[in-house]
């Protein structure tokens, strides 16, 4: 399949899951087990083949992004535990040049982080021009886990008068403004919520417990957070409603089938890069003469 065909197919696969306007979004309308027209077992090999072709196309587009050195791309991943963020990042980005990619995983904020505003640690890790930046969790934790567990807010050292009833509304506004600022400065933001079902999460947790090679992935806190499942779903839904925009859309990706999740994420990244009209820089006459002189010198020896 040619690159143009891959880009066209990628757009068709990503489009059903892209949210440009969050007002009418409802999480219940997204089936975590959805695979579009892919039949799970019969079409799984076809999906893996599509991902492999997509990885090759992505590598070509990233090379142009790096050479052109005009745009930066920021990919934000949010999800419940065991939804497959790490695997999606690993498989989709497997073919790109590490020199042009920056990956940051944001866990609980450090003491230094808490001495700054909540966007600080993410802002200082934004991708350079020509690079793809990946945030595995992000500033969105501030309207997710901090909202579900308000006690975390007390650790942020905010003046009491700034912690009012409108704090979440204010944070959504901050984030929208921040992402608009990035868009106006050539940083293309794309956000992914990998939507796994509670049932599938349970299965994956049990697999991590039963498989010695996966024990390291499991934390007892992962299981206890399931008690707050409904609270998290409400927080995710409002987060998407309040921060999905044309310049920084959310992709709400079904995550019960990892192979399908990876195809959709890969398709969205390809579609994003293809929309930037990337090309290798053209050299001027002076540079062409310089190249000709260098070639002549090399051939003469």
List the model feature ranges, each with a label.
Residues 1-301:
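Flexible, compositionally biased loop and terminal segments
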């Amino acid at each position: 399949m040619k690159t143009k065909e891959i880009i066209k197919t990628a757009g068709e696969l990503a489009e059903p899951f892209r949210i440009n306007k969050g007002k009418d979004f409802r999480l219940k309308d997204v089936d975590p087990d959805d695979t579009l027209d892919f039949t799970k077992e019969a079409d799984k090999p076809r999906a893996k083949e599509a991902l492999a072709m997509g990885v090759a196309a992505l590598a070509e587009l990233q090379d142009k992004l790096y050479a052109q050195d005009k745009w930066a791309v920021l990919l934000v991943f949010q999800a419940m535990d065991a939804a497959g963020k790490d695997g999606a990042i690993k498989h989709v980005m497997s073919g790109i040049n590490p020199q042009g990619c920056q990956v940051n995983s944001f866990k609980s904020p450090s003491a230094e982080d808490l001495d700054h505003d909540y966007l600080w640690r993410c802002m200082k890790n934004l991708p350079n021009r020509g690079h793809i930046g990946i945030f595995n969790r992000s500033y969105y934790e501030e309207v997710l886990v901090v909202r579900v567990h308000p006690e975390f807010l007390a650790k942020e050292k905010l003046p009491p008068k700034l912690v009012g009833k409108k704090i979440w509304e204010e944070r959504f506004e901050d984030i929208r403004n921040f992402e608009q600022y990035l868009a106006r400065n050539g940083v293309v933001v794309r956000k992914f919520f990998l939507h796994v079902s509670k049932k599938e999460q349970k299965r994956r947790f049990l697999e991590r417990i039963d498989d010695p090679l996966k024990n390291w992935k499991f934390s007892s806190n992962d299981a206890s957070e399931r008690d707050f499942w409904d609270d998290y779903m409400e927080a995710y839904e409002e987060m998407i409603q309040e921060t999905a925009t044309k310049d920084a859309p959310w992709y709400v990706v079904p995550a019960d089938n990892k192979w399908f999740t990876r195809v959709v994420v890969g398709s969205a990244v390809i579609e994003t890069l293809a929309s930037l009209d990337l090309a290798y820089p053209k050299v001027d006459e002076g540079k062409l003469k310089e190249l000709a002189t260098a070639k002549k010198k090399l051939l003469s020896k």
